[in-house]
């Protein structure tokens, strides 16, 4: 087992990474008599809910659970209210612990519930997808979507622990594995050139879920994110760099309808658009753009815009991005592979040109 610590100004919390952690009662920092509410969905529940309940009950915990509908389109206030109703009907107090057992949607909604219920209860994240293991479960971002924009309603709320059991990836559909690799590649592209080179050498092993490669990959991604979050917990500076490709990607998700493209798929194409714009601005070489494209393609990820979107469809969505300040578009771009920066008020004509370069042609 590996442990990565997230060091915040006022406290720290561990990320445990290993195989078989869910069934090990020692993984859970919960004492006899504690009350727990597990938030999950039917897809995850069929594989792991009984395992987690059994481990917690061996510790003497009182365990309830609530099932949310499965999918990005259910990352809503309605799903949030299902959690509140279950907590209230079960007479859960401020001393309860919410466990988010699932992928990014479950983690975000359950995390927001933990931040909100009785003004805050303890949260444990148990991510079961590659994307949530390397990204969304770490760092305290919680949110639900609005029909006009992704992650528009939420809070920063840190978990007390993250438990990453790599065995959960064995039941993950290949498309979900590939989507998670988009966020993995992002870390190398923005902050760690050596890791990017390692990914070029080992991406095939990751696609095939080789255990040693996976454990190294997940721990490296978590360490990179932990370091960034330690410097900038609430995204006032460096943490914005973690959003490479996300402004373009969120536009795709919102325009197509949540869930039609997976988040990682949209981020993949978004990274290509950001790289194309970086090259237009003279920051990155065409050779490095090509390296990024080839790596994403080897991970079976899209690198061009959906054929149902036109370049002009992007900007209205992008202007509602949370990084927009005073009506000016701010984008995460690349100075080189392994070095990102935030560009302020980039000309819209250049943005459109970059999108056009990543548009499908017959």
Swiss-Prot record:
Biological process according to GO: amino acid biosynthetic process; aromatic amino acid family biosynthetic process; chorismate biosynthetic process
Give the main location.
cytoplasm
- Any coiled-coil ranges, and where? none
Q: Tell me which EC number(s) this protein carries.
A: 4.2.3.4
What's noted on cofactor binding?
Binds 1 divalent metal cation per subunit. Can use either Co(2+) or Zn(2+).
What molecular functions are annotated in GO for this chain?
3-dehydroquinate synthase activity; metal ion binding; nucleotide binding
Catalytic reaction(s) noted: 7-phospho-2-dehydro-3-deoxy-D-arabino-heptonate = 3-dehydroquinate + phosphate
Q: Kindly tell me the pathway this chain contributes to.
A: Metabolic intermediate biosynthesis; chorismate biosynthesis; chorismate from D-erythrose 4-phosphate and phosphoenolpyruvate: step 2/7
The record's SUPFAM superfamilies line, in alphabetical order, gives: Dehydroquinate synthase-like (SSF56796)
The residues listed in the UniProt record as binding NAD(+), with positions renumbered to this chain, are 70-75, 104-108, 128-129, 141, 150, 168-171
Q: Which InterPro entries match?
A: Dehydroquinate_synthase, DHQ_synth_AroB, DHQ_synth_fam, DHQS/DOIS_N, DHQS_C
- Give the matching Pfam families: DHQ_synthase (PF01761), DHQS_C (PF24621)
PANTHER family recorded for this chain?
3-DEHYDROQUINATE SYNTHASE, 3-DEHYDROQUINATE SYNTHASE, CHLOROPLASTIC
**Biological function:** Catalyzes the conversion of 3-deoxy-D-arabino-heptulosonate 7-phosphate (DAHP) to dehydroquinate (DHQ).
How is this protein named in the record?
3-dehydroquinate synthase
Give the organism, scientific name.
Haemophilus influenzae (strain ATCC 51907 / DSM 11121 / KW20 / Rd)
